[in-house]
Amino acid sequence: MKKKVLAAILLAVGVLTGCGNSEPISSPIQTVEAEPIATDTKEVEQPAATESSADEVAPEHSYRSELTNEWIDEDLKDQRPIAVMVDNERTALPHFGTADADVVYEIMNSTLNDRITRFMVVVKDWEKIEQLGSIRSARPTNFMLAAEWNAVLCHDGGPYFINDWVAKDYSANFSGGFARFNNGKATEFTEYITYDTYTNSQKGKTYDGLKQRFANSKYTTTYNDYYQGPHFKFADGEVTFDDRSDAISATTIALPFKHNGSTLKYNEETGTYDYYEYGSAHKDADSNAQLTFENVILQDTTFAELGEGYLIYNAIDSGRSGYYITQGKAIEVTWTKSSENAITHYYDAKTGEEIQINTGKTYISLI
């Protein structure tokens, strides 16, 4: 038997140098709490999988979502998702609709304010949205990440740095003009995606929902020529790392975002990771559902500062470290993204094979 301790989620504890920076960028520290675990030395090349779903009979008129591998309506098969910028400042809470997201990215929005973060939530079945947000501005990195899903990025403006990204051939975005809700907050915290013909009761103004926004735009609601296929590889059964000698216990994951205090805690009853920030569990304002994930992916990613706290992550890279975390255990991975709109692929650092993940929702953070 041997002891392994996860002292930090990144292998490099010193400094990371961002492309275009004249000074080194400080590496995030202790993004997963250190926890000794006893493991044996048995070499296992593949994760264990249980109860194969390969022979499962599909429910009528349904298919497995390419975002979660869950059964959803077959009419959605070719529908492209949206990627929505959601404000993650304390004043913006509680969020509406985030519990319905299929994939949630959390990345640093500014080098100022103790590394404050913003969500980018990816939603396949966007026609069912009643209220999602509140919505805020985008950064250059978001255009690269949204493009991986052939998603239309929904945001409210951004710094001039995004102009070149908006103009990319593969880029698709809806900026501003979303519904305003009367929530007693400052204007920047009142904008939400909603259903078609939503009318503000105070102002009597009616807003377009996404269906009408698509109809009025040059964008198709279905995948276009820039779609590169499914983003993830899903396992037929449940992925566990119980027999992996290199697996690390990961029951509490403290992300390096001091302002938000972003933390993921493993819930043994549900087998998922519950998201916490500002010291409290994240509950959806509409459904009171806990924001929780079957899969967690962390990427060691450098960034370049653009001035005034703005930044762009060096998301195009190869062979950098990261972790795939599920069922209370983590394994080391490497990741590769070959171009601006290319899919990020994740590989088992031990076997070199592309990882297979569990059915369900996924949290991704660039740290």
PLM feature segments, named:
Residues 15-18:
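C-terminal motif of bacterial Sec signal peptides marking the signal peptidase cleavage site
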Residues 27-49:
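Post-signal peptide N-terminal segment of mature Sec-exported envelope proteins
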Residues 11-13:
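Repetitive helical segments and hydrophobic/amphipathic motifs
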Residues 20-22:
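Bacterial signal peptide processing site
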Residues 25, 110:
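Flexible, active-site-proximal loop/turn residues at the rims of small-molecule/cofactor binding pockets
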